[in-house]
Structure formats: structure tokens, C-alpha cells
């Protein structure tokens, strides 16, 4: 099997993956700020790094996968006040909702899922170390800030030069800062903030800045220097740039070897945003589409490419996934173990080892499905299920998927008992030699998105199309 190569944002190139400890991978991914339901952009991040950790395990690595939860933040505080509920009540509720969405999408839980509020002492310890090392200062307004010009390598991840960054582009001007580009490590508490929004510290009551949360949790759980750090493309700057400055400023060690960033989600070729009114939660999408269809829709696009969300693309994903399940419908796979020397498995592995190239891996699944359709071979069916399983796909009994309503069928299609009643009426028409009526029922069902297949012995099976 070829070596795994990962596109490293830091190097701006694909690099052969060499873990710090042979056979072990330590990976941290920036998770979700829990003040609302997860949206399609979150779904992409969750699925992408689920695929990454699945593949790392599949090729034999012992993986420690950490994905954090931000459960203290200005948006969280505002939403809790608006709702008249405590911060903990709000965050617990949306953490539960996030877990429900993950389960629906077939996402395996990370090995460790730390909440920011569980690591306040570690954050304060890192801030104090940064102050001792000359990277942090307490401003006149009580906030503790990071002095970006003290860190010589600032900009190495994003490629941005401090001299080219203008105050006000991404940070608001603040007279208390020594430099407008400095960012907050510890926010001084305000008098009108609710209970649970601040902690005691040598700097006074306050709460951590967003960036220090991930540095402290990553270093605490995975060590000062670990293998992979991931997140959405929008986090590359300033969040991940600031994480590097904090962590390396505090420890004097390289923070992360490989930086991975998944691409944006677009809606009809425009960036998804609430202001454009093209913003969809995972729950809204799952009301209309089967969760495995949504997962497949995400999987079949390379993780670094833009993902264009539209009903047309989801309908196409459903049709494509239906083709894969249909290939398995009448073939019982054998029970042998996956053999990486099999040609299809080799092509699949080569694709996944080429920076997790899921479009090519999925193409291999369709090659297999075509061969299964032609040969009805049990070993090929087994390979199809096994390789798809590494992507979190084709885990259901084929007929259960094929007869399940989703998309347009879910919104207004026939229920299973209605379909069975129509099939019974068609059987009765055929027995009465009223073939015109039998054909009419078949055509009517097909127009409603139901395909019939007459089997030897007189039975009829159906599936949604």
C-alpha cells in the first residue's frame, strides 16, 4: 500500500504523513460553538474529519481524536440572555442536539470531546506563561492581550504579513491594545453579564478568548507538539494562526506538524450565510433527505474543494446511492476479511492515501457496483460493502434503504402501506387478465417515484426512484 500523503496548509503542498510516534496519531479538530443548531457547514466538517479518523484507523494507526466544544463565548452569552436561560442550560441543550445530528449522519464520536469550561485553569496557566515569556500584557481595560509582533513567525500558516494586515480588516480598533492586531487572551468581566460567564483569575474576573481555548485543550490532551490539527477553511486565519502564536510562544516547541482545512459550503454557488437567507440547519435538511444521502453528498466531493449545496445535487446523490444499494439487493456478500491485495481495494486505498481523495474512492465503489450487477458475485459484493463501510456508507439492508422515503418522496410521496395496496390491486388485475389495468397501476406508481420489479414465482418488489 502506498504511503499516506496529506495536503499540509502550513507547507502549501502534499506531504508524506510521518507521525511523531510510529503507529500513533494524535489529532485535534476545532469543534462547534454551541448556541444554535448545527448547519450544513458544520455537517461538512464533522463528516470530513470522521472520514479522516476512520481511514487512519483502517490503515493501522492508533488514533487519539480530540474535537472540542466551545461552551463559553459572546454569542452563547447573548443567546442565553435573550432566551432567559442559564448558559449551561443553553449549551447542554445544543450539545445534545449536536450529538443527535452526528448520530443521524453516521459520525463516530471523537475519543475525547472536551468542553472549554472544563479547561479554564489550563488556559490561565498558558496565559501566565505567555506573560512571563513576554508575549502577553494586561491592557488598561483589564483584558489580557497577545502581542502579535513579539512572535516572529506570525503569519506562517496563512501567509499573511503583519505589515500588510490593516487594523479593522478582521479586528476592531481598540485604544487599550498596544497594536490594533493584538488579540484577546482573557476578557475582563462586564458588570451586566449573567452568572456562569466569568471565572476568578489573577487578572480579575473574566473568561478566556476563543483562540486560547483550543491551544490549551490541544496541548493539555495531546501534548505540546502533535500530529494533525483540522478545521474549516475559515479558521485558518485568524484562529489557527493565533493558536500557533499562543502555543509556540508558551512552549517553545513546534505546535502541529500537519494542518488540514476543509473547504466552504456554497448554496447555489453562493457562500452560505444567514444574511443571504440561504442558511440551512442539519435538521432542516434531514426533514427532506435521508441522512445517509446527506453523508454521501458530502463524501463524494474532495474535502478541500467547495461543496455546492442544492436540491439538485442532493437528489443526484440520492439517485447515486440508490445505484449502489440496488447492486447489493439480490446478492448475499461472502464473509471473508477485506484483502488489500484485491485490485479494487488497491485503487480505493491509493485514492484515500492521496490526501483522502474520496471522489476517486467513490468512483471505485461504482466500478464494483457495475461488476456486481453483471456477475452477481458474492466476493465483489463483500468488497463493495467493506470499502463503502470505510466511508460510513452502505451499512443498511438494501431493501430498507430502497423503500425508505426521502427527498421529494418523503415530502409528499406514497406511504409503504399505500404502495403495497397498489401492488395487491395490480396482482388482482393480472389474475383477472386485466393487463391494461395492471400496466396502468405500474405506470401510476412509477410516476409517483415507485419502481416495481416482478420476481420469479410471482412476487413483486418495489423501490423508490
From Swiss-Prot:
Q: Which cofactor does it need?
A: Zn(2+)
User: How would you classify this enzyme at the top EC level?
Assistant: ligase
What broad class describes the main subcellular location of this protein?
cytoplasm
Bilayer-spanning residue ranges: none
Write out the catalysed reaction: tRNA(Cys) + L-cysteine + ATP = L-cysteinyl-tRNA(Cys) + AMP + diphosphate
Please tell me whether the keyword Ligase is annotated for this protein: yes
Gene Ontology biological process terms in this record: cysteinyl-tRNA aminoacylation
Q: How and how many cofactors are bound, per the record note? A: Binds 1 zinc ion per subunit.
This entry carries the following GO cellular component terms, namely: cytosol
Query: Which residues are noted in the entry as Zn(2+)-binding?
Result: 30, 214, 239, 243
The GO terms this record gives for MF are: ATP binding; cysteine-tRNA ligase activity; zinc ion binding
The protein's Enzyme Commission number: 6.1.1.16
Q: Supply the InterPro entries for this chain.
A: Cys-tRNA-ligase (IPR015803), Cys-tRNA-synt_Ia_DALR (IPR015273), Cys-tRNA/MSH_ligase (IPR024909), CysS_C (IPR056411), Rossmann-like_a/b/a_fold (IPR014729), tRNA-synt_1_cat_dom (IPR032678), tRNAsynth_Ia_anticodon-bd (IPR009080)
Q: Where is this motif: 'HIGH' region?
A: 32-42
Indicate whether ATP-binding appears among the record's keywords.
Answer: yes
Q: Which PANTHER family match?
A: CYSTEINE--TRNA LIGASE, CYTOPLASMIC (PTHR10890:SF3), CYSTEINYL-TRNA SYNTHETASE (PTHR10890)
Instruction: Provide the assembly information.
Output: Monomer.
Family affiliation:
Belongs to the class-I aminoacyl-tRNA synthetase family.
Q: What is the protein name stated in its UniProt record?
A: Cysteine--tRNA ligase
Its gene is cysS
Amino acid at each position: 500500500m502506498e504511503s499516506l500523503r496529506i495536503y499540509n496548509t502550513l507547507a502549501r503542498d502534499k506531504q508524506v504523513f510521518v507521525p511523531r510516534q510510529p503507529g500513533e496519531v494524535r489529532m485535534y479538530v476545532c469543534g462547534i460553538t454551541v448556541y444554535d443548531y448545527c448547519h450544513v457547514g458544520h455537517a461538512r466538517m464533522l463528516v470530513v474529519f470522521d472520514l479522516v479518523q476512520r481511514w487512519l484507523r483502517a490503515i493501522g494507526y492508533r488514533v487519539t481524536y480530540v474535537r472540542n466544544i466551545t461552551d463559553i463565548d459572546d454569542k452563547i452569552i447573548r443567546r442565553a440572555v435573550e432566551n432567559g436561560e442559564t448558559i449551561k442550560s443553553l449549551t447542554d441543550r445544543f450539545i445534545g442536539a449536536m450529538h443527535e445530528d452526528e448520530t443521524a449522519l453516521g459520525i463516530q464520536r471523537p475519543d475525547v470531546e472536551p468542553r472549554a469550561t472544563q479547561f479554564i485553569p489550563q488556559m490561565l496557566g498558558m496565559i501566565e506563561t505567555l506573560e512571563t515569556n513576554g508575549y502577553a500584557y494586561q491592557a488598561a481595560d483589564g483584558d489580557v492581550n497577545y502581542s502579535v509582533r513579539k512572535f516572529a513567525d506570525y503569519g506562517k500558516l496563512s501567509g499573511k504579513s503583519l505589515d500588510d494586515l490593516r487594523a479593522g480588516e478582521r479586528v476592531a480598533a481598540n485604544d487599550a491594545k498596544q497594536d490594533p492586531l493584538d488579540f484577546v487572551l482573557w476578557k475582563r468581566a462586564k458588570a451586566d453579564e449573567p452568572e456562569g460567564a466569568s471565572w476568578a483569575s489573577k487578572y480579575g474576573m473574566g473568561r478566556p478568548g476563543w483562540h486560547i481555548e483550543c491551544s490549551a485543550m490541544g496541548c493539555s490532551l495531546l501534548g505540546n507538539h502533535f500530529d494533525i490539527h483540522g478545521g474549516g477553511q475559515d479558521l485558518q486565519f485568524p484562529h489557527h494562526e493565533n493558536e500557533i502564536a499562543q502555543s509556540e510562544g508558551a512552549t517553545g516547541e513546534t505546535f502541529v506538524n500537519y494542518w488540514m482545512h476543509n473547504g466552504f459550503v456554497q448554496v447555489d454557488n453562493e457562500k452560505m450565510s444567514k444574511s443571504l437567507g440561504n442558511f440551512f440547519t442539519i435538521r432542516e435538511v434531514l426533514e427532506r433527505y435521508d441522512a445517509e444521502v446527506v453523508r454521501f453528498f458530502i463524501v463524494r466531493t474532495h474535502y478541500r474543494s467547495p461543496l455546492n449545496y442544492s436540491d439538485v445535487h442532493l437528489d443526484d446523490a440520492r439517485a447515486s446511492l440508490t445505484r449502489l444499494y440496488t447492486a447489493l439487493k439480490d446478492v448475499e456478500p461472502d464473509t471473508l476479511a477485506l484483502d488489500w491485495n484485491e485490485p479494487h481495494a488497491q485503487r480505493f486505498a491509493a485514492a484515500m492515501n492521496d490526501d483522502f481523495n474520496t471522489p476517486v474512492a467513490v468512483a471505485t465503489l461504482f466500478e464494483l457496483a457495475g461488476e456486481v450487477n453483471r456477475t452477481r458475485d458474492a466476493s465483489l459484493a463483500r468488497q463493495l460493502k467493506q470499502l463503502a463501510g470505510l466511508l460510513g456508507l452502505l451499512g443498511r439492508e438494501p431493501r430498507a434503504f430502497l423503500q425508505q422515503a426521502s427527498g421529494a418522496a418523503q415530502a409528499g410521496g406514497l406511504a409503504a402501506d399505500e404502495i403495497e395496496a397498489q401492488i395487491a390491486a395490480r396482482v388482482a388485475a393480472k389474475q383477472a387478465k386485466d393487463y391494461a389495468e395492471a400496466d396502468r397501476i405500474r405506470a401510476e406508481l412509477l410516476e409517483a417515484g415507485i419502481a416495481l420489479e416482478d420476481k420469479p414465482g410471482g412476487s413483486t418488489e418495489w423501490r423508490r426512484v
